[in-house]
Amino acid sequence: MFKVYMLMSLDIHKHSYVGYTDNLKKRLMLHNNNKGAKYTRGRQWRVIYYKNYNSKSVAMKEEFKLKKTTS
């Protein structure tokens, strides 16, 4: 099962980030320990949205759509 997720930073500027993963708990830990995507480094994050998908390809397409609407 794959998840498309949106994160919100805990800092005053409220940055957002969209991604996909098969392990959301582990991925959030990586983002919060400066091991995630380059954009997320140096900030603390919380999950504000996620949705499950049965296939990686569908999750990737949905991630792309969500990134386009939030940028």
Language model features with spans:
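GIY-YIG nuclease catalytic motif and its immediate N-terminal context
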Residues: 1-53, 58-67, 71
